[in-house]
């Protein structure tokens, strides 16, 4: 599994990356949607993109669709903010992962 994390790699996001690596995922990271798109356009591919809910999820997903880049997008955010989860799903994310990360939840998403 190749995981691209689109967020600042700190705190709970860093913890989620570590859990994913423990489960065998190859993890890469960018901080912005533009950086993520550039990476995906280049030689880097990802089976799963995990993006911070504070970033432009809808722009990422629209760009992926327009450029015919096929990958699953999952949003993540601190706590159980129901409104943030709804916005992320409405923007096109397949799931919302609350942070701090739960090892079993990370494992389920990677499967």
Please give the residue ranges for each predicted region.
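Two-component/phosphorelay signaling modules centered on CheY-like receiver
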Residues: 8-31, 35
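Receiver (REC) domain switch/output surface
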Residues: 106-111
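Acidic, metal-coordinating helix/loop segments flanking the phosphotransfer/catalytic sites
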Residues: 31-48
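A Lys-centered signature of the CheY-like receiver
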Residues: 99
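Alpha4-beta5-alpha5 "output face"
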Residues: 65, 86-90
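Short amphipathic alpha-helix used as the core "switch/output" element in two-component signaling
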Residues: 56-70
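A short, hydrophobic beta-strand element within the central beta-sheet of small alpha/beta folds
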Residues: 4, 49, 70-81
